């Protein structure tokens, strides 16, 4: 037992405030320990009982996710999910957030976000093969938002480029709700290199516990608690809670760990991420149903006179904790030292289910593992039965609220003047949320490792060739994986359930658009405080939607991250919550990457087709057009029929597999007109399009948004075969689904007619100039 005389004297109220604990939490801690905690133990409980580590507000909602499927090898509970992608290959993947650190130290916050998610991947025995990111910032007309964007992109680029993992795709959106609280979500993928998946549960009493990697300092102390609280005007004072990363040590750590794992001498592995040594030791012990004892005097440190509290709560980067075979310890230490890494035995696995910490020859913490990991508190909340009144009011909006169309011009409620359709298309293309993200992704090395099939921006999803390090594939037919991150935050803010359904559907659609079969998801739930009625209702509605959509599309959840309290408070204590942003990271598999297709048109006179669903709604309510042209964020997002969504995606994949489709692009932000323009821009080719008239308004035809819609082009040399194929599969007998030709690829001009009426006539050069120079124009 811990000696009561070792308990620190501390101000309880102040300590609880620092650790973000309540007096009820403290009483529960005393009950679990059967005594009062000392200051070090209170800090350990503070980080382990934070939302960031134990999901105390979201755990009941997450339990409803579908987590099993034919390709799922490892689901939630380990460092990352694992799926079978065929040919005896296993893909490891996960998404994590680093929102609060990036708000106050954008470069290091984003850089260490990349480092942390990479460690989750290679801790499982996988070589990281790709990184994607999902970013949110306030509008770029504010210098502070420009600075945050510049810092975050630089941090992601620096760490990913230096460590040698390609950044292959992502998404970014701008909205004032993120001005005080940007979102930085990073997804990583890895290909398993070990014979067995490396898990985190400690085994074999008496086995040594090995610390590997960088030294421990005071950086990042309390980072998990910091990430579980709102940002205020004084949050800049929390800069010490932001970690400092070294990608070159991370690179050595990747190679050394994979080398060590292949020996079979590592029994269990856990990276030291959030809550550092506290979390890694507690989770290893709990997952193995054993205990761990650690002597802090043996931990390599970079600073003098560190307290036990600082050792245990430090989130210094590039550190790992292993349980290893005792007879192999010297061989392993030699391997790690060869890579310039510290490798010290700092403890052992013990039989009792406790985490016991010693420092300066005294026991400074002794806590049951269940209290830190398995049996953590759950905050139960009542869920609102009905949507809030402010949303019910917005849902009543319809297109009759807009000005009438007069002589092919539309009056903008935002700018108080009329514009032609061509002018509107150009204005939408220049909006930073729709415009090219080239200024961002050109800073990333997307080609390192030489397995990236399409460069960022060229396809709806990233496609990675799966190639072992020692390639023995003589046929040169490589399978691959596709990945996409998606979320329309505007839709989720207007209807959390429908908006999240759409996020899952769009991520699967993007993967299908390159010819890959969607397999599984990881998710990053970015929300505001769950302690408000509306905040928890948004979170609950979104989780219900993920469950429903993933079941319908047969894409189970393998894990992810919950980031709550994403809101900012100004000097007047006014709280601004972010738009709820449940980012979906979808992965899919493709048997032959040579069959993967990109977005741009391929040949002049190729036919352009549209597939969609009559049951999946399309509307200009909640659309980009309504926000960016009319200045209104209102209306109810369209409902998506998930069975039709699944059918449309399957139809497209089969058409790609049968070598008919040569390009495809999903219709999302900005509607059909923007999707067509993007295909023209990427190919430097035009399109001649003729569309059916809408009963009410032509802007509905051009700019409405909804699910289940994809444009694709058919090889001009296969028109007859394509026609026979459609007859054979009787596509139009599917009463809810339509497949129709809408035009053909032409040169230099995007021409759109609606019912024989010329709507727009824009040169590809003009489209490209607006699209490519928007974001870069701010810097």
UniProtKB/Swiss-Prot annotation:
Residues in coiled coil: none
Annotated residues for binding of Mg(2+) 1: 96, 561
Active site per UniProt: 52, 98
An annotated Gene Ontology molecular function: ATP binding
Disulfide bonds: none
Catalysis performed (reactions): N(2)-formyl-N(1)-(5-phospho-beta-D-ribosyl)glycinamide + L-glutamine + ATP + H2O = 2-formamido-N(1)-(5-O-phospho-beta-D-ribosyl)acetamidine + L-glutamate + ADP + phosphate + H(+)
One GO CC term, this protein: cytoplasm
Alphabetized HAMAP family for the sequence: PurL_2
Family: Belongs to the FGAMS family.
Protein name in the entry: Phosphoribosylformylglycinamidine synthase subunit PurL
Source organism of the structure: Prochlorococcus marinus (strain MIT 9312)
Organism lineage: Bacteria, Bacillati, Cyanobacteriota, Cyanophyceae, Synechococcales
Gene behind the chain: purL
């Amino acid at each position: 037992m811990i000696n009561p005389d070792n308990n620190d004297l501390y101000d309880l109220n102040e300590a609880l405030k620092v650790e973000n604990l309540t007096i009820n939490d403290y009483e529960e801690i005393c009950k679990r320990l059967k005594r009062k905690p000392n200051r070090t133990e209170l800090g350990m409980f503070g980080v382990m009982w934070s939302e960031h580590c134990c999901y105390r507000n979201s755990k009941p909602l997450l339990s409803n996710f579908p987590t099993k499927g034919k390709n799922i090898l490892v689901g939630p509970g380990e460092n990352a999910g694992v799926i079978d992608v065929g040919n005896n290959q296993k893909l490891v993947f996960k998404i994590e957030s680093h929102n609060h650190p990036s708000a106050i130290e954008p470069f290091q916050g984003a850089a260490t976000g990349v480092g942390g998610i990479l460690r989750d991947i290679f801790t499982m025995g996988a070589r990281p093969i790709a990184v994607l990111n999902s970013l949110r910032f306030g509008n770029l007309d504010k210098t502070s938002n420009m600075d945050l964007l510049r810092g975050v992109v630089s941090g992601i680029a620096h760490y990913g480029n230096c460590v040698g993992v390609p950044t292959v795709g992502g998404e970014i959106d701008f909205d004032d709700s993120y001005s005080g609280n940007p979102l930085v979500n990073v997804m990583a993928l890895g290909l398993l290199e070990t014979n067995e998946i490396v898990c985190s549960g400690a085994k074999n009493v008496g086995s040594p516990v090995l610390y590997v990697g960088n030294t421990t300092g005071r950086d990042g102390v309390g980072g998990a608690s910091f990430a579980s609280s709102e940002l205020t005007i004084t949050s800049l004072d929390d800069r010490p809670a932001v970690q400092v990363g070294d990608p070159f040590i991370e690179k050595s750590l990747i190679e050394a760990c994979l080398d060590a794992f292949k020996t079979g001498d590592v029994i269990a592995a856990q990276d030291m991420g959030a809550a550092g040594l506290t979390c890694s030791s507690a989770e290893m012990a709990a997952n193995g149903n054993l205990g761990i004892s650690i002597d802090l005097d043996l931990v390599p440190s970079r600073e003098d006179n560190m307290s036990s509290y600082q050792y245990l709560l430090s989130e210094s980067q590039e550190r790992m904790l292993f349980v290893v075979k005792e007879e192999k310890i010297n061989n392993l230490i030699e391997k790690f030292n060869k890579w310039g890494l510290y490798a010290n035995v700092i403890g052992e696995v013990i039989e009792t289910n406790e985490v016991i910490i010693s420092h300066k020859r005294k026991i400074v913490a002794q806590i049951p593992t269940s209290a830190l990991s398995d049996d953590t508190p759950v905050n139960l909340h009542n869920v609102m039965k009905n949507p809030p009144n402010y949303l019910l009011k917005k849902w009543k909006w319809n297109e009759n609220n807009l000005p009438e169309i007069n002589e092919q011009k539309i009056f903008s409620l935002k700018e108080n003047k009329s514009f032609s359709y061509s002018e509107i298309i150009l204005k939408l293309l220049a909006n930073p949320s729709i415009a090219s993200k080239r200024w961002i992704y050109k800073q990333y090395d997307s080609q390192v490792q030489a397995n990236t099939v399409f460069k960022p921006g060229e396809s709806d999803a990233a496609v990675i060739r799966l190639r072992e390090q020692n390639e023995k594939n003589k046929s040169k037919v490589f399978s691959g994986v596709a990945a996409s991150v998606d979320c329309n935050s505007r839709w989720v803010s207007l209807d959390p359930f429908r908006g999240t359904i759409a996020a899952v559907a769009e991520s699967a659609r993007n993967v299908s658009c390159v010819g890959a079969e969607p397999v599984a998801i990881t998710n990053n739930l970015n929300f505001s405080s769950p302690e408000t009625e509306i905040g928890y209702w948004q979170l609950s509605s979104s989780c219900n939607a993920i469950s429903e959509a993933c079941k319908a599309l047969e894409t189970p959840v393998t894990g992810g991250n919950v980031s709550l309290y994403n809101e900012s408070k100004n000097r007047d204590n006014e709280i601004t919550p972010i738009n709820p942003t449940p980012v979906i990271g979808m992965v899919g598999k493709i048997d032959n990457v040579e069959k993967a297709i990109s977005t741009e048109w391929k040949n002049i006179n190729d036919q352009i087709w549209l597939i969609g669903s009559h049951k999946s709604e399309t509307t200009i309510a909640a659309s980009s057009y309504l926000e960016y042209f009319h200045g209104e964020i209102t209306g109810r997002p369209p409902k998506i029929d998930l069975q039709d969504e699944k059918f449309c995606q399957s139809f497209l994949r089969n058409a790609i597999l049968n070598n008919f489709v040569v390009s495809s692009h999903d219709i999302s932000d900005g509607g059909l007109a923007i999707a067509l323009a993007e295909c023209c821009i990427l190919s430097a080719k035009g399109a001649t399009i003729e569309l059916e008239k809408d009963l009410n308004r032509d802007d509905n035809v051009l700019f409405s948004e909804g699910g289940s819609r994809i444009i694709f082009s058919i090889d001009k040399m296969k028109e007859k075969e394509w026609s026979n194929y459609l007859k054979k599969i009787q596509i139009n007998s599917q009463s809810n689904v339509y497949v129709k030709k809408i035009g053909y690829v032409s040169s230099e001009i995007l021409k759109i007619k609606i019912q024989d009426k010329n709507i727009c006539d824009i040169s590809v050069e003009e489209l490209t100039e607006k699209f490519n120079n928007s974001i870069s124009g701010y810097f």
